[in-house]
Every structure is written in C-alpha cells, then in structure tokens.
Amino acid sequence: MSVRIDIHADDFGESVHASRDILECLKDGKLNSISVLANMSCFEECVRLYREAQEEFPWQPAISVHVNLMEGSCLSDPKDLPDLVDEKGHFQISWEKLFFVSFLPSRNRFKKQLKKEIELQIKAVAGVFSELNLQELRIDSHQHTHMIPVVAEALFEVLEEQGWKASYIRDAKEPFFVFLQKTSLYKTYRPVNFVKNILLNYCSALLQKRFRNAGIKPMYLWGLIMSGHMDEERIRQLLPNMEKKAEHNGRMLEILFHPGQVLREEISDEFSQEDAIAFHVSPDRSVEKQAVYALDLAQKVRKR
C-alpha cells in the first residue's frame, strides 16, 4: 500500500492528565500528529509539559489547532459572543444549534461571533508553538464543528482576511460501507455514530469546493463510527479495506484516537457540555491508548 496514513491524537490541552497521556504516546513514537486546544485553564501548563518532554520525542509531531466551540472558556470578551457563551464565558452553544443556524437568516450574526473566537484560538496556539507556520496551518476542531456550514464559512473568512493559509484542514469524511464489509462487527457499532457519520459526510459534500480552492489535499477520517472506542481488534480487521478505499480514491487516511483521559477530579465548570463529560473520563480512552501502542502504526507509516 502506498496510501499516506496519519496516526493522530485529539485533545492535547484538555486537561493535564489527558495531555500527559498524549505526551507518553509521543515519547514512545506512537503518534504522528496531535491537535491542541487553547481555551482550557490548563493550557499554559500543558504547553510547558510539552516543551519539557519534546527532547524525548523520536520525531516532532505535526501540530493542529483544535478549535473548540463546544466547551471551555472563550478567548474573546464574553460580551462579544452573546449567542455562544454564558455569563462566565463558558461555551453553551450546541452542535445541533450551530448546524440549524447555518440555514437561517441569523447565520451572519453567529458567523461574526464565530470569526472573533476562531481567530483568537488560532493565534493562541500559533503564538506558543513556533512549529506552526501561519502560511501552512493545520486546523481541525472539537467535535468536528468546523464542518458545520456557518463555522466553516467563518473559518475560511478568517484565513482570507488574516492572510493565513492552511496546508491541512480536517475533512471529517469517513467511508461508510467499509464498516459493513465485516458482518461480524455489526453489533459492535453504536447506532448514533452512524448518524454522526452520515451528517458529517453531508457537511463534507458541501465543503468540497472550498477545500479544493484552498488547496487542501483530499483525505478520509477514521474515527466517527468507532468514536469513543477505537480498539485494536476492530482496527486490525478493518485496516486493510480502509487502506484500499483510501488508495483507490487517492486520499490520505487519518486514523483518529483519543488516548488522553481526563480525571474525574479535573472536571470543573469549564467542562460546560455535561453530556460530553462521560466521554472525557471514560475508561475507553485507555482502550484507545492501548490500541495506539499495540498497533504501533506511527513509525511504520513514517517509513513509507
């Protein structure tokens, strides 16, 4: 196989413990790239931990800005984001509301607020990671909100207005039928994740022209239908067909893991999306970390 594969971890900077987990993976050469979010209170400490550990990395990972509009504190003045945050500045908007707003007359009001925050979050990460070139930015987002039409429009306008360019923007386009080729796995999938897959594939279709015009290379993401439980056994079974699919369509393949676990005692009011807390503290994050180690794909794909 000649397809390019990226072994990626989201959520560096979500909590100190989660970030330490990710740093352990980096030091052991198990990841090719990570996403960094800048709007949690532990951000500066996590950056310090990264710098302390960096010399132990066998190679330097690619770093993406993990735009976070679902949780944490806004970097903007809360008064400038009345539709997105509460009185404490914590995000309180839902994914679903942003999606539906994309098709309503109020979209421009929301887009103006989104642009302020997206710009500040990109600047915050780029400001402490000199590895990030503002002419070759890598961008993704918490819960893939950048795929929502109004958020995507805000993001691309920020890039254009600031004179920034992106070499990578995650296209959360996950092949659907690959998961149906192994009938023995049917009962292992959560039905709600099929809904996520279909919805994000719809959003992806709306964004293909923007991606092409921005020079973003075509890709597949693997990590939606198995979201929350990217385990070794199923990945081994599905990987050959997933690689074939990516190679056939001339797309790179990003395999997305969440190997960093938030401790229950780290949960505070900045984790403002209550439904997501169980995901953050779930033991399944340890399952994903174990898979990253057992599969040991990061170094293999670097040699291709």
Show the residue positions of the predicted features.
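Terminal accessory/targeting
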Residues: 1-6, 16-134, 150-304
